[in-house]
Each structure stands twice: as C-alpha cells, then as structure tokens.
C-alpha cells in the first residue's frame, strides 16, 4: 500500500540533538564508564533510563539495537499498526521453528527494533490486567510488593489521561477516577466512532450476562465488554520514545542513548566476580567489538527473545547446554530461555451487508485512504487517529457446561481467579476476503502451551532459535473453540439481523449457518489459521529469592550472578491475561525504585 509508506529522509540515521545525549556513533560518547548500563531502549528500558537519571549524579548509558524512529509517519499514525509491524526497518521479525501443532507453519513474532521497542509497533492497548493476576504474581514470587494494591500506584504514576480528539463524546467509556492525571504515558478513549459501535451496544444490552457492558476494565475486574483505552496523545501513538524518552528527558546531561548498538555479551572483569560491563557492536559500523563498563549494575531489557539470547551467549544458563554451544559458563541458571508463553489467536471473519466497513474502505478504496491520511496529517483526526478496535470482550469459560467442567478438571484452571478471563475477543470493522466484513480476534489469554528460546548450535551469536510451542496443549485449542462459539453467540443478537451475512470460508465449516457445530472442522480451522498472540513473556521468569527454579529474584537480580538484573516481559512467571504493554511499564517503574533503593 504505497500511499501508507510515507517516510522521512534518513530513516536509519539519527539527528543528534544539541543536548548531545542521543548518539549514533560510539566515538562521540563522553565516556566508556557509567553507573548503569541498560541493554535495550524499549518499553522497560526507557522507564529505567528515565527514572534512574532523575538523580542528576547518576550516569546511565542505554544501548539500543535499532535506530531512532522520531518523526517517522508510519510509527506515529495509530491506525498504521495494522500495516507497520512487520517492516524490517523497525522489527526484528523473529522467526520460529515450524510448528507441528499448527500445520507445520513457520510463524513470525514482531519485536521492536527501534528506540522505544515494541511499544512503537504494537496495538497501543492500555490494559492493566485483573487484580488477581498481580496477587498471583505476589504469591508465586513470595513478594507482596507485586500484589495489586502495591502495584496500583505505579499505574497511576506512569499515566496521564488525555481527551480524545475530533470532538467525540466519550462519556461513559471509562472511569476517570481510576486513571493517572500527572504521569508520563498519555492514554485516551478511542478517537473515532465505527458504524458498528451502535450495533455492538444494542447487542450487549440484549444479551447481558457475560456480554454485559462494564464502565472500565482497568479497575481490576475486567470481565464483560468495555470500550478500549489506548496509549495515544492528541491523535498520535504514545510510546516509550514519545513519553519516557521525550526530548525533555533526553536533554538530561546524565542520560546517554546510543542507537544501532547491539549488545553481544555481558561480561565480568574477573572470573567469579560481578557482571560489570558489556561487549557490543554497531550495526551501522565495522562490526568491531566495543566495550562499556558499569560501576553499579548492568540491566538487561532486551525483551522475551533478546534477553535469554544475550544471557545464554554470556554464559548464563544450563552449564551442560552452554558447553554444547561452546559457550563458557559463568553461572548455572537452567531456566534461562524456558517457559516461553504467549496467547494463541485466530481471526474470525463474517461477511456483512455493508459497503463502508472501515478497514475494508482503507485497504480497498485508495481515495478514501489518501483522504484519511491527509486529514490525519493536517489535524491528527479522522479514522487514522484511532486504533483498530473500539471494544474488548473479556470472557470466562461457561463453567455450567459439562464439557468445560471436564476440561477444567483434567487440566486445571489456569486463570488467576474466577474474576479473570480465559478468552478475549476484539471486534474489528473489516477483515479477510474481497468483500466487506467484520472480524473478531479470538485470544486464549490463559494458555497452557509453553515454548523455548535457545541458541543456534552452529552460530550461537546468530538469531535465537525459537520454538513457540503454539497449541501444544489441547486446553488452548478448546478455549479457542469456545471463543468461536462465544463470538457466534454475540453475533446472534437481533441487532445483527440485517448486517451479518455468513461466516467466512473455512470458518463456515465449523459453525455452519444452521447453528450446528462441527468440532473436527473447528479444530482443523484453528490449527491451520491460529497464530501467535504477540504478547510473549516468561523466558527469564521471576521466582522467590533463594528458589532453585526461575531466573530472577523478585528484585530482578539474576540468580547466581552479581551486578546483573533483567527487567522486561521475560520475567513474568505467568502471562498477564490482558495484554502486556502496561504491565511492563508498571514492573519497570517498580524496578527503578528497587534499584535506586539498593544503592
């Protein structure tokens, strides 16, 4: 779609500001020694860099593997997250091994390769998760500081609620009393009304029960259907780069950010000593190894794939496995790279009696798309000022159903409580095929399937070997099947009688228009169409201090290693059940306080 591929010149170079703290040349750095080195300037690393440099005497170096995305149109337009995530300019595009449980397909994970990390290319969802998710994390780690009551102030600290643009009346779409007013990351209600919004509201009022509307899913009790909230400011994407790395913070003389700098190893100055430095190279340079020293700590925030890859290459992992890679072990931490956890999702599409579904208009009507882009460029309003969905459905399995009861008896209930969802549906106006349609993205948000991240035996320093483990648990397939039935139930409301035509080809075999269910066809559809949910976590999971399992203690310190912490999505012992962006911001905020308090 050429009309959406507008870019500013010199995308891969960085215009160094007059403050001289954003660099693309290591030779221009003022020093090779800092108090803290943060590996990765993404969703978590940005928070750490910002908060640690609030003390003007603390010197911080951030090493980011990607370029700066400042001023790049495709990273600013909210609606563009439908198109931009796979662009290799901004994305590591992590390929996984063929998944024999998903028709032997090779799936691709987006991972932000840009200052600001995956917050630059994600769906911008503002979701804190159920309170019980956080209470479970506190119980698993033995640290009450991870409970909902203790983490809640960090949500408020990081957020600033802002008005929607374009004059939309957002009354009743959220509860302002539970949102931050003076934080760093801007949030808002949707900026655009879809033609299906009134139909959704009518259907909710008709069906009730699990489809009952709720005011705000960020109060810790998210079950029901609510308006989405987004990390957006004045009609533009709000991300880690525009918030925690805003110009006023990059202007600090003690914050030094080097882009296009990939860290190869964390290192010790002597065997058995603390980690006190890194080796890295510049992607836009000669590839020669460069060095930087941390006087206090090295903090790894390289993400769910990058963090275990870096730890393993540094000799932190299972000793025998490391030896097979010809990597010299420095710490025996066997769980590094294990426990890869992600939602699985399948997109459900129905043809509709309409010619104006938004996504279809944008992708099939170039005049409309160009006009929408022009409107956004002029005023940051219009359809491009919004995310792709206005409503989120958070549902539990129907525990009065004997089949559900049997599955829960066999596999246990992986949700954190009876107030947390198993299923999330996201309504999208548009979809697959040549005609007009609506879609519902169907996620299992309490997956039992697990994967792994390891090194390539022939090239350990090359891209990681990722086995997503998608749909390895029959429970996950069952939950996706139940999600399909829940979506069909919602679309059976009379509000849709003159709008919905039929399920799309493939889906129609599992849920024919006669109302029957073909479970064999449904499973086949899921295994051939399901993909990763792009909320991957868990590969450096947190466990109680002193535990022999896990990778980091509750204060993020890597087990059996001094001077090294991990702060990013990889530390979650269980995947948050409502997106991951905001939980990552929250844990990084607390990590910054813990780090400050330890020195």
Curated annotation (Swiss-Prot):
Record carries keyword Transmembrane: no
Keywords: FAD, Flavoprotein, Glycoprotein, Oxidoreductase, Signal
Glycosylated position list: 93, 169, 191, 234, 260, 284, 319, 339, 353, 365, 370, 398, 456, 518
Binding site for FAD: 43-44, 64-65, 122-125, 569, 580-581
Pfam families assigned: GMC_oxred_C (PF05199), GMC_oxred_N (PF00732)
Sections of the chain in a coiled coil: none
EC number assigned by the record: 1.1.-.-
GO molecular function, one term: flavin adenine dinucleotide binding
Endpoints of the signal sequence: 1-20
InterPro entries on file: FAD/NAD-bd_sf, GMC_OxRdtase, GMC_OxRdtase_N, GMC_OxRtase_C
Cofactor: FAD
Keyword Glycoprotein in record: yes
Enzyme class (EC, first level): oxidoreductase
Function as written in the Swiss-Prot or TrEMBL entry: Dehydrogenase; part of the gene cluster that mediates the biosynthesis of erinacines, cyathane-xylosides that show unique biological activities, including leishmanicidal activity, stimulating activity for nerve growth-factor synthesis, and agonistic activity toward the kappa opioid receptor. The role of the dehydrogenase eriK within the pathway has still to be determined.
UniProt family annotation: Belongs to the GMC oxidoreductase family.
Subunit architecture: Homodimer.
Entry protein name: Dehydrogenase eriK
């Amino acid at each position: 779609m050429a009309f959406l591929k507008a870019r500013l010149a010199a995308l891969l170079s960085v215009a160094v500001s007059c403050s001289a703290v954003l660099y693309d040349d290591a030779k221009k750095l003022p020093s090779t020694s800092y108090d803290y080195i943060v590996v990765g300037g993404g969703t978590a690393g940005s928070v750490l860099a910002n908060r640690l440099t609030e003390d003007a005497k603390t010197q911080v170096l951030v090493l980011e593997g990607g370029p700066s995305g400042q001023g790049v149109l495709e990273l600013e337009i909210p609606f563009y997250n439908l198109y931009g995530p796979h662009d290799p300019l901004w994305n590591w595009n992590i390929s996984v091994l063929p998944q024999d449980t998903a028709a032997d397909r090779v799936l691709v994970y987006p991972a932000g390769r840009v200052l600001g990390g995956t917050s630059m290319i994600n769906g911008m969802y503002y979701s804190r998760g159920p309170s019980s998710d956080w209470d479970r994390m506190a119980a698993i780690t033995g640290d009450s500081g991870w409970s909902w009551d203790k983490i809640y102030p960090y949500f408020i600290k990081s957020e600033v609620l802002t008005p929607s643009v374009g004059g939309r009346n957002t009354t009743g779409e959220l509860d302002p009393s539970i949102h931050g007013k003076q934080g760093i990351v801007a949030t808002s209600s949707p900026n655009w009304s879809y033609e299906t919004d009134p139909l959704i509201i009518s259907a909710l009022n008709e069906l009730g029960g699990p489809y009952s509307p709720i005011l705000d899913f960020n109060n810790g009790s998210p079950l029901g259907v609510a308006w989405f909230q987004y990390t957006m400011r004045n009609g533009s994407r709000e991300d880690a780069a525009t918030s925690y790395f805003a110009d006023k913070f990059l202007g600090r003389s003690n914050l030094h950010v080097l882009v296009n700098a990939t860290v190869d190893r964390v290192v010790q100055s002597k065997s058995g000593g603390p980690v006190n430095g890194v080796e890295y190279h510049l992607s836009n340079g000669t590839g020669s190894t460069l060095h930087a020293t941390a006087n206090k700590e090295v903090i790894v925030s390289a993400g769910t794939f990058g963090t275990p890859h870096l730890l393993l290459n540094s000799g932190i992992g299972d000793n025998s496995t490391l030896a097979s890679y010809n990597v010299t072990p420095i710490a025996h931490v066997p769980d590094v790279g294990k426990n890869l956890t992600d939602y699985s999702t399948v997109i459900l599409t129905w043809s509709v009696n309409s010619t104006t579904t938004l996504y279809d208009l944008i992708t099939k009507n170039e005049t409309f798309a160009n006009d929408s882009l022009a409107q956004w460029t002029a005023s940051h309003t219009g359809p491009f000022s919004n995310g792709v969905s206005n409503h989120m459905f958070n549902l539990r399995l129907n525990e009065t159903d004997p089949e559900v009861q049997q599955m829960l008896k066999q596999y246990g209930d992986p949700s954190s409580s009876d107030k947390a969802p198993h299923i999330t549906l996201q309504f999208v106006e548009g979809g697959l095929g040549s005609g007009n349609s609506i879609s519902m993205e169907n996620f299992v948000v309490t997956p039992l399937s697990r994967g792994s991240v390891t090194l390539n035996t022939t090239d350990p320093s090359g891209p990681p070997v990722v086995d997503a483990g998608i749909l390895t648990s029959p429970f996950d397939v069952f939950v996706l099947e139940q999600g399909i039935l829940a979506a069909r139930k919602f679309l059976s409301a009379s509000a849709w009688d003159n709008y919905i035509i039929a399920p799309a080809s493939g889906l129609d075999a599992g849920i024919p228009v006669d109302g029957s269910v073909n479970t064999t066809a449904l499973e086949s559809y899921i295994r051939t169409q399901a993909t990763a949910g792009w909320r991957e976590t868990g590969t450096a999971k947190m466990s109680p201090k002193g535990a022999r399992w896990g990778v980091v203690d509750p204060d993020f310190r890597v087990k059996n290693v001094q001077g090294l912490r991990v702060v990013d999505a990889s530390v979650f012992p269980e995947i948050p059940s409502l997106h991951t962006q905001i939980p990552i911001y929250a844990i990084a905020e607390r990590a910054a306080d813990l780090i400050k308090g330890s020195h």
